[in-house]
Amino acid sequence: MKLHELQPAAGSRKVRNRVGRGTSSGNGKTAGRGQKGQKARSGGGVRLGFEGGQTPLFRRLPKRGFLNVNRKEYAIVNLDQLNAFEDGAEVTPVVLVESGIVKAEKSGVKILGNGELTKKLTVKAAKFSKSAEEAITAKGGSVEVI
């Protein structure tokens, strides 16, 4: 193989199809838009959800539910994730964010009981599940709601 024999992989390069450049090109005259009509014009086409004047589906269906502006969303941490800390360490939301276990604090951190805790820790968080609280205290650690 020589330098002048190098070629791109088959199908990796596709020539852009220039439309409206003469009838013999195969895409001249109407440029693949069919005959006349709204969709053939420049800027033509109907808006999203338009059904030709018929009441669109999104207006035929009833409204449902609401968005609670006071909704609290907690960052969730499971017990097995807390094993990343040293024995006897104090775990706070700030420490969890710094260590990368939690991306953002949100409305606070909630500790759930999935997995097994092997370290004695002092955990400070906004909420704890019952099983998580029991597991932390069973290992000799302490729980503090902040």
UniProtKB/Swiss-Prot annotation:
Residues 23-35, 42-51 have a biased composition (Gly residues). The keyword Oxidoreductase does not apply. GO terms for cellular component: cytosolic large ribosomal subunit. PROSITE patterns: RIBOSOMAL_L15 (PS00475). InterPro entries: Ribosomal_uL15, Ribosomal_uL15/eL18, Ribosomal_uL15/eL18_sf, Ribosomal_uL15_bac-type, Ribosomal_uL15_CS. Residues 1-51 are annotated as: Disordered. One of its GO terms (molecular function) is structural constituent of ribosome. Keywords: Ribonucleoprotein, Ribosomal protein, RNA-binding, rRNA-binding. GO terms for biological process: translation. It comes from the Bacteria. Belongs to the universal ribosomal protein uL15 family. Part of the 50S ribosomal subunit. Binds to the 23S rRNA. This is Large ribosomal subunit protein uL15. The lineage of its organism: Bacteria, Bacillati, Bacillota, Bacilli, Lactobacillales.
